[in-house]
Amino acid sequence: MVVPQKKFANGKRNDSTKSFKPMKKPFKKTKDDVAARSEAMALQLEDVPDFPRGGGTSLSKKEREKLYEEVDAEFDADERVSKKSKGGKSKKRIPSDLDDLGLLFGGGLHGKRPRYANKITTKNISPGMKLLGVVTEVNQKDIVISLPGGLRGLVRASEVSDFTDRGIEDDENELLGDIFSVGQLVPCIVLELDDDKKEAGKRKIWLSLRLSLLHKGFSFDSFQLGMVFSANVKSIEDHGSILHFGLPSITGFIEISDDGNQESGMKTGQLIQGVVTKIDRDRKIVHLSSDPDSVAKCLTKDLSGMSFDLLIPGMMVNARVQSVLENGILFDFLTYFNGTVDLFHLKNPLSNKSWKDEYNQNKTVNARILFIDPSSRAVGLTLSPHVVCNKAPPLHVFSGDIFDEAKVVRIDKSGLLLELPSKPTPTPAYVSTYDAAGDEVTKLEKKFKEGNHIRVRVLGLKQMEGLAVGTLKESAFEGPVFTHSDVKPGMVTKAKVISVDTFGAIVQFSGGLKAMCPLRHMSEFEVTKPRKKFKVGAELVFRVLGCKSKRITVTYKKTLVKSKLPILSSYTDATEGLVTHGWITKIEKHGCFVRFYNGVQGFVPRFELGLEPGSDPDSVFHVGEVVKCRVTSAVHGTQRITLSFMIKPSSVSEDDSIKLGSIVSGIIDTITSQAVIVRVKSKSVVKGTISAEHLADHHEQAKLIMSLLRPGYELDKLLVLDIEGNNMALSSKYSLIKLAEELPSDFNQLQPNSVVHGYVCNLIENGCFVRFLGRLTGFAPRSKAIDDPKADVSESFFVGQSVRANIVDVNQEKSRITLSLKQSSCASVDASFVQEYFLMDEKISDLQSSDITKSDCSWVEKFSIGSLIKGTIQEQNDLGVVVNFDNINNVLGFIPQHHMGGATLVPGSVVNAVVLDISRAERLVDLSLRPELLNNLTKEVSNSSKKKRKRGISKELEVHQRVSAVVEIVKEQHLVLSIPEHGYTIGYASVSDYNTQKLPVKQFSTGQSVVASVKAVQNPLTSGRLLLLLDSVSGTSETSRSKRAKKKSSCEVGSVVHAEITEIKPFELRVNFGNSFRGRIHITEVNDASTSDEPFAKFRVGQSISARVVAKPCHTDIKKTQLWELSVKPAMLKDSSEFNDTQESEQLEFAAGQCVIGYVYKVDKEWVWLAVSRNVTARIFILDTSCKAHELEEFERRFPIGKAVSGYVLTYNKEKKTLRLVQRPLLFIHKSIANGGGSKTDKPDSSIPGDDDTLFIHEGDILGGRISKILPGVGGLRVQLGPYVFGRVHFTEINDSWVPDPLDGFREGQFVKCKVLEISSSSKGTWQIELSLRTSLDGMSSADHLSEDLKNNDNVCKRFERIEDLSPDMGVQGYVKNTMSKGCFIILSRTVEAKVRLSNLCDTFVKEPEKEFPVGKLVTGRVLNVEPLSKRIEVTLKTVNAGGRPKSESYDLKKLHVGDMISGRIRRVEPFGLFIDIDQTGMVGLCHISQLSDDRMENVQARYKAGESVRAKILKLDEEKKRISLGMKSSYLMNGDDDKAQPLSEDNTSMECDPINDPKSEVLAAVDDFGFQETSGGTSLVLAQVESRASIPPLEVDLDDIEETDFDSSQNQEKLLGANKDEKSKRREKQKDKEEREKKIQAAEGRLLEHHAPENADEFEKLVRSSPNSSFVWIKYMAFMLSLADIEKARSIAERALRTINIREEEEKLNIWVAYFNLENEHGNPPEESVKKVFERARQYCDPKKVYLALLGVYERTEQYKLADKLLDEMIKKFKQSCKIWLRKIQSSLKQNEEAIQSVVNRALLCLPRHKHIKFISQTAILEFKCGVADRGRSLFEGVLREYPKRTDLWSVYLDQEIRLGEDDVIRSLFERAISLSLPPKKMKFLFKKFLEYEKSVGDEERVEYVKQRAMEYANSTLA
């Protein structure tokens, strides 16, 4: 709507004449104006009223308008005069965009009408404006939207919707990309405008898509049918999606269409558009339809009272042309509003200059609202065909495209409209005057003509207009860079410097694009004054570094600009050997980071920098330096590039022996403050670096050695830690050199829970990095590095420290190694730490001697640990005594106070002392004069005259022996100990360990007792010292890992060595042999073939034995690398032949059936595991260990650990080196299976379950088995024979004798002894094994002979395996297999079955065969008939007398007389009468239909049923024909009993809350007999559920049909309402037709089985072929298979039935589905999952509601209430408008005695349609009466009768329920209320009649008369 002419943005009129002055910049707004608009936005975009307060006027409306026109005319005249007079003449100027865009704020109006159409620009857009935009980009944190006028807006992720709980900030990219798509039209609102900091003069437009802002001011009344609204998807439900409109109390909903299309692709948070289809004003729910065609075609209706606030961008309106403007059209729409359309939004985007002719006044068109400005109340419309169709205009061109043949369509004052020949359709383009003529002032009409073809280049795109912006300037076609797509990394181009700042320079290409040259790239060197380097306006040559997010970066470094080397701009371009230029971005100690083009980055390791050893990279390189580098490796997937500054690769050495972990020697070249540089001795000149920390394991010794080393000194043993180019990193640490072969250099060499040596390479706050060989590095987190959680890592370790690391985890995928450095898990297990200290002490002593000769070190040889030495006292002080030695210079002795032994020493005296310790570096000897040391020593002194007397080495001490010691001297690094128990032998122990060097050490005192272990005896490697390990240092006992012995050439595989046993383990002997070699002897390497249970009994620790080395240590396993494999088998030691590795491989060959021996090392519940050899293990399954049950029960006891067990090879897994054994011989030819032996044995056992087992099971085998399942009915037992092999024991093969319950005493999991009777293969390729548990079979009896009872009782125990073994009149026994109404089947053996007809079941009549002959019952009978060809056997179960004739034949008619009263049972009901079995006679009589009743009887079958007990009178006896005529009329029985000959009906008063079965249930009830369980009511759980789906509970009384159930037909007519007579009669007819159809089906199905019931599968196949659409037959077939325990076959029959039954027979198919439900519910594995799968399939083919009800019935009958409740909840959600579903929910709740019924009722009333409320409430009340609380039922009835007091059907049902309860006072009171109503006579007659019948049944004559009197009174009052 166009605003009044002189109103401003705030709506206030300003009468000041200053306000009418011409404005030079009408669009420029002050900061205050913007701030005011922002404030308005913050106040939720409230409109400011025209007159905020006061200011009334006395002028009328017409007078005001006239005054405004006069002022406007005067103002326009003044404006024109002032323009002309200023400067004397008007100036020519280029028309600006502001002139033809039109104003939104009153500056461009002419009279009452605007001169220009409203257009949006950056200068007039303001907060609060609503616009229609199109999504152009979906970024990680925002959305870019193209707005009208070519503007670009941004939407933050937090402004896309009103939802705050979506977690947008966690994963914005995924969320925004899911709910928005490029090209989507969206309505938005302007939040704020920001000045773009990156580009001056541009403003950022921040938008919001929140509907709470767009729909502000809307109310529920604003929603009208047919309107289009935007909404956010709040949640997705089963039936549709819940929508959010941004309004607090209004909810939307979109239902899922039938085809489900509406649901596809819809996601939570998505913004959609929909047409209002339904409005629920009660619940304030608006239903929408999101059909795109409906949304696009929907017009906004012209509603009364619509305000400006209700207009939303995107609305389609019917607009009428009001006038044509200079650059558009003015429309009015919706009666009250005006809007404009500019030239670029016309219907034809390529309109020529005559476009105005197309829009005549009052012409109506469809337009869509483009934008709305609430402040000026201006509206923009669009006629663009695509936007009107609710689609974004397509664009077929791109920025930078050049078109040589663009056609001029129209020439305007502001520019040219062109037609670009794009495909598939032309695209309009507009060229402004500036881009067409440049700075020249010229008229476009003179230069261009319409229809001309010109060359144009696309500058940009306006997506909302579908318009391209072009230029005709020549400069636009010249430059190589015009758009961002033209920019390629590495390209060289010219650019002009336009600005210079402290961060760099901004340059501009010839095409207009801008780029940045960072400060570091302005020169090769550091630039301090960039403005002097770059001059604004200078044109320079640059190289493009990259273009990311339309931001171009360039460089001016000369080396890069002029480089001729290949450009590296992507990781895929990086190939090994590529040489290119880059620049350094970061320098670290371990290398440099180098960057290339487009952000590609690589790393140069330190050894590839080409530095001299000891040089610092920072001193050689600087950040920003351009370098030439070579790619050494590239991993494209992980984007890792490794580089080298050494262009030509060089090898470390030509000597291949130098590799990681090798030992080398070298000569010191130079020494720096941090490292020692050595020249390594090799074929080529190679240098190595030894850091100061790697000179020794002890930190103090390393510093001392560093100070003593000099160039030229030779270092003999150096470990190669790492090879860095042509340099090597070396180490002189003894701990690493000693275990060089064990140090890992690759992930594959690491094994969790092993301990390895390494060194600390770096420390951080969170942990410690430990390095091994090469660059293999692990990390020890702080929690795993120190035992004390409060300790600091930096205070516990130092860089370079030797450590022992426990490998916790190895993650090769992430290349991560997790370590533990805790002393508790990494303590030393040897004395290497203190040993290294003494070795380094010797080395330091040698270094200290200026002349390394023997004479300088010879003094040490004069002293020996523990020997006596003679010396002279030099001086004495508080600490002790200093001693001089004769003929030994510069060596002193020292006796501490503790070791003076109480003697008084004076200077000059001579003493003989014991040597305790020697410090070669300090040239000091520690001595002792303690008597116990001296006295013990003198006992071993010889009588020689030598001054030097030596103690003998104690032979009693052994390695690993634990001893008690006494501290003699406490040194800084070690203790001097004596061992009193072993002659005071002197030993040495370290006070710290590798990992505790920096930690405080435990304080020891002289004389303290400690416990230690002997780790090394005196030898040259220990400097002649006995080395001990303190328990306090090790923390735990010695682990299994010990130091690895060096490999000696004398030890070879096959050599015989002498070894000493150090440890005896359960399955191996640990030995030491040779020079520090360690090995083991496996338990299988002791004896040749003996099965001794204790092979190690003859060995003891310390024993010396001879053994042969049979295998080298396994290098792949770090834990076992130190152990050689040895053997002491006699045959192995005798064999002098050459031994090699081939002998080892021969032991891995095994043949099937081969007998092998192993030793038990593990037993679990199922398997016993054996060690067969060093590398091969075996396992035996529990059932393969014995065939006796009692032995299997004691399985674990029979196989103690270490026992020798033999077995026969069944299978062999060569890959895992595992045998499968059995303990019974296998009957087949031996065959090698080491290489497979066949296709089956190639694979592991698990891959061929059961196949190998069945190959070695034969008929007649006696096996051990375990009962895995007791099958239902007469299915027998399922017995497990192997891990994956099962067999079946037939019901008749369980016991020898015929016992009533063969399964009694058996349980699942029980072990049994069984015999294989038969092995056969099924059609599926699986093996079926028939077993027997009968002890009478050969091999099954535990005694030597059978009992006499079993031998003599052949008839009882015999099993007839063939039909030929049977003959008529032979006595047989068997078990009932299944029972039907026509008879039953019995099983005589596992192969023979027989049929028993109903007439032969019993001597007397059998009323219910299923109950009297249940499945599994033991019966005895006689064979009547045998048909070998058809394999049919008929048996009778009737008993016989002595004469062999039936008892019934012994009776005679003479015993009966005419007139006698007899009792009996109805045998058969015929249309002509009843056949009655007369009790105690066995004879049958006929009662003709004429003799049944005194009245005429139409339908005999409806009144009488077979099996009912009746009384009758004998009317006639025909002895010739042996016929008896009976009569049952009442008159015949008057003199007898009062009992009438009528069926015994059920008590109608005892009603339950169970559904009533339809008539079909009687037929289908026959399936109860086929092996299914029954409930207490006798209803089948599996197949009888077929009828329950159509069942109606007795409480579900249809109130519309209530008359049918409660009254006779005459009463019904009185009760029916007149308006419903036709409808109800139709329903009654339908019900009657349905009942007749069910009866026909029942009769037909009965006839199918009348003549001959199928007895085997072939007969059933014939039957289903003849009646393929009968579900009854198919279900019978399923039941038959289930009776045979063949569940899979029953399933296959169900599947066949579903495929076979015609698709039109929906009821029959549904019957099969329900039977399928019950089948899976009983036999599924697991049942719940199996039923669910079948249920999901059934829903797709049948009526879902019926399927749900059927499954609910299954769950309720099987009392699975949790599943039933879960299903009911789902049903309520899916069918919430179904009354039946809600009633089932209430019925279920009442059954489970739940009290919260009212909440269910309330929910149901909210969901159900109103017309179903009465029915629901009344039936709920009936349920309460019958199953719940009667008072609640009364309350419900009373409530509904208050609303509908004249509904006699409600009164009738209410009365019936009260009558059923039997409270007379309540009933009579209710009747009194009913007959007091004012109802029509017919209804009152019905009530009175019901009252009268009630009183007749329970009352007396007085009450009957009372009712009659009340009826007369009513009749009289009515007639009056």
UniProtKB/Swiss-Prot annotation:
One Pfam family linked to the record: Suf
CDD domains named in the record: S1_Rrp5_repeat_hs11_sc8, S1_Rrp5_repeat_hs12_sc9, S1_Rrp5_repeat_hs1_sc1, S1_Rrp5_repeat_hs2_sc2, S1_Rrp5_repeat_hs3, S1_Rrp5_repeat_hs6_sc5, S1_Rrp5_repeat_hs8_sc7, S1_Rrp5_repeat_sc12
Keyword line: Nucleus, Repeat, Ribonucleoprotein, Ribosome biogenesis, rRNA processing
GO molecular function: nucleic acid binding
Repeat listed as a keyword: yes
Subcellular location per the Swiss-Prot or TrEMBL entry: Nucleus, Nucleolus
UniProt main location, coarse: nucleus
Any single GO CC term annotated in Swiss-Prot or TrEMBL for this entry: ribonucleoprotein complex
GO biological process: embryo sac development; rRNA processing
InterPro entries in UniProt: HAT (IPR003107), NA-bd_OB-fold (IPR012340), Rrp5 (IPR045209), Rrp5_S1_rpt_hs11_sc8 (IPR048058), Rrp5_S1_rpt_hs1_sc1 (IPR048059), S1_domain (IPR003029), Suf (IPR008847), TPR-like_helical_dom_sf (IPR011990)
Tissue expression from the record: Highly expressed in flowers and at lower levels in roots, leaves, stems and siliques.
HAT repeat copies, ranges: 1651-1683, 1685-1722, 1726-1758, 1759-1791, 1828-1860, 1862-1897
Keyword Ribonucleoprotein listed: yes
Null mutant phenotype: Aborted development of female gametophytes.
Source organism superkingdom: Eukaryota
Region annotated Disordered, chain positions: 1-65, 1535-1555, 1605-1652
Boundaries of every S1 motif domain copy: 128-210, 226-291, 314-384, 400-473, 490-557, 577-646, 661-733, 753-822, 866-930, 958-1031, 1054-1129, 1153-1224, 1260-1334, 1369-1438, 1459-1529
Biased composition (Basic and acidic residues): 1620-1652
Function: Involved in the biogenesis of ribosomal RNA (rRNA). Required for the formation of 5.8S rRNA. Required for normal development of female gametophytes.
The protein, known as: rRNA biogenesis protein RRP5
